[in-house]
């Protein structure tokens, strides 16, 4: 059964704090195992990569078989049904349109002293996209990661995807082509992350690694950060639904289960001021669970990490939502916009009963790569900005240096950095 909390209970604060602190991540020896793999690939390159692929994916290759060929991609596209390809194309187009609006603008201006200042944006040269394999192979995630990179101007986009027993999801390859991926390699796990970061004879290193994966992939991304950039450390998926008594219990239950079916560690939460709705949603969840193909996963998620939180009024939901900082926030109330405007922390917000989070997963246009595990308190979802760098620009002439130089020299001396002061003083004939 899910956790039931009531804001009016005397022990609510204690129970809510415990609920927030409950760990949903796989831990134990994952980091040590990932470190061993990353270090091995860094040392031995392709040899270590091929050994790990044989061990974990039961796929024996030589280095020439790592890259997925153009012929394989073409065959995969032909194997996909037309309706699904059309849906992927629609998703790609909407994602591209949305992300083009995020492109930042360069700036250059002159201040009252005549100093020229500004900044400019440039795309990173290369990015690596990690795509999970097996049952968690999601072509939509390929588009969500690849399209913003291409919009930003990344010229080399490398995809790695595990191929258990040699099998690749044709839709993943089709999405890679639609998204503008330039290279695809049939490797996964911590070993693929290591190859993208350190490079091997076959796979050239990239500047940044993005994309979700299991606990070993997440640990490997932590380990290579600094050598390369990373997007975020993705945890189990989560949704928070805030609803009043106008909410449709069947719809809300379906949305809660849409997250629960992802992973046994996924989290689905309802906050409501309606006791009737809370009871109806709980009944609807139990009924719908019986009809889901992934009922075992969804049932475990709902039982272990689900929650229904009662509040006296929806004003009480606001600080709770900010504390939860959910990856996905759905608001099904009479005035969802007004409530959303008062909530600070959420990865993405879905307004109104006709905006299920699943639309955002696929064809809404906004990105579904979002901060989890309360990291929406300080971070944002994937965007064009993740694939770009901002460089500041400064230009002084003789007059501007004379106006600003003495103050800079004073600060240099105050910090004990005499060479700093001298580099200015020589230009002003003061050193």
UniProtKB/Swiss-Prot annotation:
Record-linked CDD domains: Histidinol_dh
GO terms of molecular function: histidinol dehydrogenase activity; NAD binding; zinc ion binding
Pfam families: Histidinol_dh
Cofactor, how bound (note): Binds 1 zinc ion per subunit.
Top-level taxon in the UniProt lineage: Bacteria
A single cellular component GO annotation: cytosol
Active site: 327 (proton acceptor), 328 (proton acceptor)
Names of required cofactors: Zn(2+)
Pathway note: Amino-acid biosynthesis; L-histidine biosynthesis; L-histidine from 5-phospho-alpha-D-ribose 1-diphosphate: step 9/9
Recorded catalytic activity of this chain's protein: L-histidinol + 2 NAD(+) + H2O = L-histidine + 2 NADH + 3 H(+)
Keywords: Amino-acid biosynthesis, Histidine biosynthesis, Metal-binding, NAD, Oxidoreductase, Zinc
InterPro entries cross-referenced by the UniProt entry: Ald_DH/histidinol_DH, Histidinol_DH_CS, Histidinol_DH_monofunct, Hstdl_DH
Residues binding NAD(+): 130, 191, 214
Entry binding sites for Zn(2+): 259, 262, 361, 420
KW Nucleotide-binding (keyword) present: no
Listed EC numbers: 1.1.1.23
GO BP: any one term: L-histidine biosynthetic process
Family, as annotated: Belongs to the histidinol dehydrogenase family.
Protein task: Catalyzes the sequential NAD-dependent oxidations of L-histidinol to L-histidinaldehyde and then to L-histidine.
Protein name: Histidinol dehydrogenase
Natural source organism: Bradyrhizobium diazoefficiens (strain JCM 10833 / BCRC 13528 / IAM 13628 / NBRC 14792 / USDA 110)
Upper taxonomic lineage: Bacteria, Pseudomonadati, Pseudomonadota, Alphaproteobacteria, Hyphomicrobiales
């Amino acid at each position: 059964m899910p956790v039931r909390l009531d804001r009016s209970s005397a022990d609510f604060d204690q129970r809510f704090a415990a609920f927030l602190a409950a760990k949903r991540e796989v831990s134990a020896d994952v980091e040590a195992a990932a470190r061993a793999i990353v270090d091995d690939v860094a040392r031995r390159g392709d040899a270590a990569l091929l050994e790990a692929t044989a061990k974990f994916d039961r796929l024996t290759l030589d280095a020439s078989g790592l890259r997925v060929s153009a012929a394989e991609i073409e065959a995969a596209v032909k194997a996909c049904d037309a309706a699904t390809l059309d849906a992927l194309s629609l998703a790609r187009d909407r994602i591209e349109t949305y992300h083009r609006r995020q492109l930042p603008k360069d700036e250059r201006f002159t201040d009252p002293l005549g100093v020229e200042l500004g900044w400019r944006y440039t795309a990173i040269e290369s990015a690596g996209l990690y795509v999970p394999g097996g049952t968690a192979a999601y072509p939509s995630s390929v588009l969500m990661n690849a399209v913003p990179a291409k919009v930003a101007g990344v010229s080399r986009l490398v995809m790695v995807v595990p191929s258990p027993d040699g099998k690749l999801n044709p839709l993943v390859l089709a999405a890679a082509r639609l998204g503008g991926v330039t290279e695809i390699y049939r490797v996964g796990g911590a070993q693929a992350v290591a190859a993208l970061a350190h490079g091997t004879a076959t796979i050239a290193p990239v500047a940044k690694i993005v994309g979700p994966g299991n606990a070993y992939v997440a640990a490997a991304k932590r380990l290579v950060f600094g050598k390369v950039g990373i997007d975020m450390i993705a945890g189990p998926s989560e949704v928070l639904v805030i609803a009043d008594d106008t909410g449709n219990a069947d719809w809300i239950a379906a949305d809660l289960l849409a997250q629960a079916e992802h992973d046994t560690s996924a989290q689905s939460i309802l906050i409501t001021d309606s006791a009737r709705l809370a009871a109806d949603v709980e009944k609807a969840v139990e009924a719908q669970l019986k009809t889901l193909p992934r009922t075992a996963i969804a049932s475990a998620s709902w039982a272990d990490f689900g929650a229904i939180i009662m509040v006296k009024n929806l004003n009480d939901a606001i600080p709770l939502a900010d504390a939860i900082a959910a990856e996905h926030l759905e608001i099904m109330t009479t005035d969802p916009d007004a409530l959303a405007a008062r909530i600070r922390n959420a990865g993405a917000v879905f307004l109104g009963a006709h905006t299920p989070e699943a639309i955002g997963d696929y064809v809404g246009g906004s990105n579904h790569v979002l901060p989890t595990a309360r990291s929406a308190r300080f971070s944002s979802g994937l965007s064009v900005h993740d694939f770009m760098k901002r460089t500041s620009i400064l230009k002084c002439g003789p007059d501007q240096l004379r106006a600003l130089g003495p103050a800079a020299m004073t600060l240099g001396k105050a910090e004990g950095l005499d060479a700093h002061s001298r580099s200015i003083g020589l230009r002003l004939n003061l050193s």
